[in-house]
Amino acid sequence: MIVVDTNIIAYLFLTSDHSTQAEQALIKDPIWCAPLLWRSEFRNVLALYIRKNILSLADAHQLTNEATLLMQGREYDVASHQVLSLVAKSTCSAYDCEFVALARDLGLPLVTTDGQIISQFPDYAIPLEKYIG
């Protein structure tokens, strides 16, 4: 089991330069988890695609359903004090620190492409490219 940030989930469901790597990560470990925040962030990505006419509303609904099914049962609330503690030690956003806090709490790696998270939390975060080998 691994913690993934919203970018990794988005790469899996939306065509990008990292889509193949996200698929390889899923093959390596199909049990992904994330803070509940991933849902709102994913909807925000889909909103951008809808507004740029890259995705239809129906397609966005379908992708939301597929992503939710993938993450079902492995979405977690993260305690505010844990998030704020990490915020105080870094320049990462509280959003990013939710993913780090979950990884720390579960004792799992956080797979991400976010350079800021990787550089500020090397004990918890691992680059997607490194994770898939």
Region spans (language model):
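Entry/capping segment at the start of metal-dependent catalytic domains
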Residues: 42
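Residues that scaffold the ATP/ADP-binding catalytic core of kinase and kinase-like folds
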Residues: 11-12, 45, 120-121
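Short, well-structured N-terminal submotif of metal-dependent ribonuclease cores
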Residues: 1-37, 49-58
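Alpha-helix capping/helix-boundary segments
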Residues: 8-9, 38, 99, 116-117
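Acidic catalytic patch
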Residues: 36-39, 59-90, 101
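Acidic, PIN/NYN-like endoribonuclease modules and their adjacent C-terminal/linker elements
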Residues: 1, 92, 100-133
